[in-house]
């Protein structure tokens, strides 16, 4: 099959790589334009563009795709069979969806129609979903509304964060995509639509995974401990707080159970009324902080200007005192 691959972040690389190594032909890659990503305002290529360059694949990085007649005509001239889209970053308009002979196909990192949109992995972690997965869908004009060809579900482990779950889903996306492309090749002359499943027949709630905003990264100590824990995992490694005027990225915490709270070794400060207050500083355990519900132990963090530190190192570096506050 002659394929044009659309993608931008690291997440897309495993899918492009597996297709390159297959018997299919990647005739071009479309990615987002180079962007200023460093303090020196240097233009940096997307991970997919950099990977495609190493593979000597023709690359397009249009500033816009809607009503871009020269670009659309260029795509038509390539006579491709399929568009494969993995985290490209823009919704493809109808005039582009209609170009490939056998449709545009997308691997979406959620159990659709749950978490349609830009940040499905983050929101599945943020909301404490027990399962997630990957769906291969035939793209339509709506936001992740297409009919599904394949789907596979995986359990979200308690230890998963954004990095680990993204890696798992990236590998799963690649595996399912190759399976889907092989199926499409074998069934070129058959009615594919009869093999597809409409999302509204799956009995799942429609939810939307909006883009993560700068304000989302702030830890709200007035929230429930479990929600704080989920946020830290979902936004790893960028969830942050403020201590004595310095930014502190929180990488790992533990929510104390009721039995642990009663454990005499913690000697928690008891006469507190506000969240975000330091309840105890215990050398071999860590810094214990109040929330709306249960206290949490700060296990791993990155202090502004320093490397990642674990609990004992954090105590040495921050020199915190019981009764001080972390600010959101």
From Swiss-Prot:
Top EC category: transferase
Any one GO molecular function term: methionyl-tRNA formyltransferase activity
Keyword Transferase: yes
InterPro entries: Fmt, Formyl_trans_C, Formyl_transf_N, Formyl_transf_N_sf, Formyl_transferase-like_C_sf, Met-tRNA-FMT_C, Met-tRNA-FMT_N
A GO-annotated cellular component: cytosol
Described purpose of this protein according to its UniProt entry: Attaches a formyl group to the free amino group of methionyl-tRNA(fMet). The formyl group appears to play a dual role in the initiator identity of N-formylmethionyl-tRNA by promoting its recognition by IF2 and preventing the misappropriation of this tRNA by the elongation apparatus.
Protein name: Methionyl-tRNA formyltransferase
Organism: Prochlorococcus marinus (strain MIT 9215)
């Amino acid at each position: 099959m002659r394929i044009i691959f659309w993608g931008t972040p690291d997440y897309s690389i495993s899918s492009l790589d597996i297709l390159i190594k297959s018997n299919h032909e990647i005739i071009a890659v479309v990615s987002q334009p180079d962007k200023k990503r460093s303090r020196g305002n240097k233009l940096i290529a997307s991970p997919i563009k950099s990977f495609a360059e190493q593979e000597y694949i023709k690359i397009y990085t249009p500033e816009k795709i809607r009503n871009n007649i020269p670009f659309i005509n260029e795509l038509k001239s390539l006579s491709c069979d399929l568009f494969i889209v993995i985290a490209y970053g823009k919704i493809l308009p109808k005039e582009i969806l209609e170009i490939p002979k056998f449709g545009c196909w997308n691997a979406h990192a959620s159990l659709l129609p749950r978490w349609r949109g830009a940040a499905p992995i983050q929101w599945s972690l943020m909301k404490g979903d027990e399962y997630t997965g990957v769906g291969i869908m035939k793209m339509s004009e709506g936001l992740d509304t297409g009919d599904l060809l394949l789907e596979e579900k995986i359990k979200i482990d308690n230890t998963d964060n954004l990095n680990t779950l993204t890696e798992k889903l990236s590998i799963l996306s690649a595996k399912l995509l190759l399976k889907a492309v092989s199926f499409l090749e074998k069934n070129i002359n058959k009615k594919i639509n009869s093999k597809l499943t409409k999302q509204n027949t799956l009995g799942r709630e429609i939810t939307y995974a909006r883009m993560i905003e700068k304000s989302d990264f702030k830890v709200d100590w007035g929230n429930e401990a479990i929600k704080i824990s989920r946020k830290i995992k979902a936004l790893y490694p960028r969830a942050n707080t403020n201590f004595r005027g310095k930014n502190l990225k929180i990488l790992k915490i533990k929510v104390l159970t009721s039995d642990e709270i009663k454990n005499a070794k913690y000697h928690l400060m008891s006469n507190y009324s506000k969240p975000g207050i330091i309840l105890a500083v215990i050398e071999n355990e860590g810094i214990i902080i109040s929330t709306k519900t249960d206290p949490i132990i700060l296990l791993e963090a990155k202090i502004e200007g320093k490397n990642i530190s674990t609990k004992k190192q954090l105590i040495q570096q921050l020199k915190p005192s019981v009764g001080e506050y972390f600010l959101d």
